[in-house]
Amino acid sequence: MAAANRGSKPRVRSIRFAAGHDAEGSQSHVHFDEKLHDSVVMVTQESDNSFLVKVGFLKILHRYEITFTLPPVRRLSKDIRETPVHSLHLKLLSVTPTSEGYSIKCEYSAHKEGVLKEEMLLACEGDIGTCVRVTVQARVMDRHHGTPMLLDGVKCVGAELEYDSEQSDWLGFD
């Protein structure tokens, strides 16, 4: 009987916050120092004719316009184009020579979840033998994990239609 009475009384305990902490939710958000990381697309030269472009987190079934700058490459002239062998999910939109190198604008389609790499080959207009390989790497989240903060140079330009098998319009056989 004593055990039954002991469980019926609610126990109340207080929580104390250390000095300087605000009790109203300031600890529920993650804050990063501005100096820890830049919020821009990162371009890294892997070899003489190969670059890795990291575009951060993207959402599945969305299309993105990605703009980045390649440093000056002696193998390329101002007449750059994409080679005929290209990716289904990465399309070159424009190449503009700048004082820092080349401003590249492309469209990327986030077609599946995970860390994805898509490649494109850039070549000079008259010479197919001199190519530069550009690999775009993205971390694609599924649709249930929220909306990612896009890096500078990445812009969402559209969403692909989702197919959900539970919402089929097919009525079946008669």
Swiss-Prot record:
Free-text disruption phenotype from the record: Adipose-specific Adissp knockout mice are defective in WAT browning, and are susceptible to high fat diet-induced obesity and hyperglycemia.
Functionally, this protein is described as follows: Adipocyte-secreted protein (adipokine) that acts as a key regulator for white adipose tissue (WAT) thermogenesis and glucose homeostasis at least in part through activation of protein kinase A (PKA).
Cell compartment(s), UniProt: Secreted
Organism this protein belongs to: Mus musculus
The PTM Phosphothreonine maps to T147
The gene from which this protein is expressed is Adissp
Tissue-specificity statement: Expression is adipose-specific and highly brown adipose tissue-enriched.
Similarity section: Belongs to the ADISSP family.
Recorded hits in InterPro entries, A to Z, give:
ADISSP
Enumerate the UniProt keywords alphabetically: Acetylation, Phosphoprotein, Secreted
Protein's name according to its UniProt entry: Adipose-secreted signaling protein
The UniProt entry's GO biological process terms, in alphabetical order, are: adaptive thermogenesis; glucose homeostasis; positive regulation of protein kinase A signaling
Which residues, renumbered to this chain, carry the PTM N-acetylalanine? A2
**Pfam families to which the protein is assigned, alphabetical:** DUF4517
GO cellular component terms listed in the entry, alphabetical order: extracellular space
Specify the domain of life of the species encoding this protein.
Answer: Eukaryota
